[in-house]
Amino acid sequence: MAEADSFLHLARPLGPVAVGTAPTTAPLNVVIQPQALFSILDHSLRRNADQERVIGTLLGTRSEDGTEVEIRSTFAVGHTETTDQVEVDMEYQKQMLALHLKANPKEVLVGWYATSSELNTFSALIQNFYSGQGDGTWPHPAVHLTVSTEAGKDIETRAYISAPVGVTAERAADSAAFIPVPYEIRYGEAEKSGLEAIGAARDAEERRANIFTDIEALERAIEDVLGMIDRVSRYVESVIDEEAPASTALGQYLLNTLALAPKVEPADIERDFNNHIQDVLVVSYLANTIRTQMELSNRLATAQLTLGGESGSGESGDKRGGQRGGKGGRGGQQRTQERSGEEARAPYPFLCQPRRTRSYEERTNEAQNGKEEKK
């Protein structure tokens, strides 16, 4: 959200302008991404107990005309600060900046941050370092973002640019006039939903939050919208009854919001909404069905592979035994076919029998028997 405090915003060249150099216009708006703020808060929580504040570098994008700066990411820079002097690890800052710009070529150096709302002489020194030529943001002004992180108080954020002050160049090097500029924290619906889910665990003892389903999230969103409508209605009624002061800006905002409402009948809106709910339910049912089918298919494939490996060995053994038995069967069958072929070639099977060879004793006995018969 934008800063509510009123201030005078000056758009003017910052720093000494060289001959032939066009004047640089200060940014009219600073956009802060939520992840950049989270990084700053995390750095503040990890600081040493004796450190009052920590500083770091701001990275982001800048519009072509330089009127808008978007802060997307940050990284911490070590520094030592006392009542008399301040020391910043400039070499570390340069190396980390080179690494970040190599990983994200679209981002550029836009400024620096500090976790304290106080502006002092050391702030001017650091500001001049970040806005200088060479490794600084020159010819664009450097944005200084302050984030107060005092315990027990709300987080307060401010954005500044600087203008050089001082009669001489030596005095201008350690002096600067900080000029506040408007800013806004811009986030999308996904980031808002994630932040609400994280914030739901704030009051829980276990610091855990359950993730809502689509239907539950839709129900909560509708309840929030109804609550906001009731709150706005009560405010409008109190203004009409002169119980609360009127706000022209708020009235204009409400008027613009009402102008965005579609000019349709409530019955048509209800019908379209019910159709949308039916579509969401159908898509959810189909997604669950496909997920279940895929899981079942994977389990069946796994079971088939497991059972196939066990039965494969048994089938191979049976196959080998069958092959051996088959060979014997083919041999016997072949011999049977040969015998049947010989029988077919002989019209009288008994003629094909081989002659029996008689021994010497048998022939002698036959001869004696023949002599006796003759007698």
From Swiss-Prot:
The region called Disordered is annotated at 307-375
User: What role is this protein assigned?
Assistant: Component of the eukaryotic translation initiation factor 3 (eIF-3) complex, which is involved in protein synthesis of a specialized repertoire of mRNAs and, together with other initiation factors, stimulates binding of mRNA and methionyl-tRNAi to the 40S ribosome. The eIF-3 complex specifically targets and initiates translation of a subset of mRNAs involved in cell proliferation.
> Can you supply one Gene Ontology CC term for this chain's record?
eukaryotic translation initiation factor 3 complex, eIF3e
Similarity comment: family membership? Belongs to the eIF-3 subunit F family.
- Which CDD domains has this protein been placed in? MPN_eIF3f
Q: Which GO annotations describe the biological process of this protein?
A: formation of cytoplasmic translation initiation complex
Q: Name one GO molecular function term.
A: translation initiation factor activity
Subunit field text = Component of the eukaryotic translation initiation factor 3 (eIF-3) complex.
Query: Which residues belong to any copy of the MPN domain?
Result: 30-166
UniProt protein name: Eukaryotic translation initiation factor 3 subunit F
Record's compositionally biased regions (Basic and acidic residues): 336-345, 358-375
Q: Where in the cell is it found?
A: Cytoplasm
Q: Where is the composition biased (Gly residues)?
A: 323-332
Gene3D superfamilies per the UniProt record, alphabetical: Cytidine Deaminase, domain 2
> What keywords does the record list, in alphabetical order?
Cytoplasm, Initiation factor, Protein biosynthesis
Q: Note the HAMAP family from the entry.
A: eIF3f (MF_03005)
